[in-house]
Amino acid sequence: ITHYQEKSISNSAEYSFSNRSGLGNIMLESLNLFNSLGKETQQFKTSDTIKFVLNLKNKMTKKVNIQIAIRLKGVDQSFDAMLANEYLDKNITLNQGSNSVVCNLHNLPFSNSSFLVNVLIKKNQVIEDFVQDILYFEVIGGFFQKESYVYPNNYKGIYLEHDWIIK
């Protein structure tokens, strides 16, 4: 199954936007991933920083505040996490037309894993664009030693250190 999923997701810059839904007033035009060295890639090392660059189109005639969430889903279903500006109380305001938003995921805590990426864009809690399995990336081995914390069993996730920048 993992092999099939890896082969069914394009590793090129030609992403598939066929599996999308939402109102469409604000839409994701492209998503690019960069490593700590600024190189566009889909392979990362443990403890690396992933820079998610989202190019968005605001079709409305005014500035709008939006919420963006990036879901990282393990291909083997062993991991599911979300990066979102709402978690950090960070406002993202888009101008009319094209906009660029960056989410930096710092100190990548994964090793030897493969992930699918979903992107959700909302305005006033209404889904404007939801693109599923838009991109595939993998984390290859690396050396990473870090102080860790064991979360209680009733805690349903882990916090991933990230920040948002509007360009």
Describe the function of each predicted region.
Residues 1-167:
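Localized sequence-composition bias
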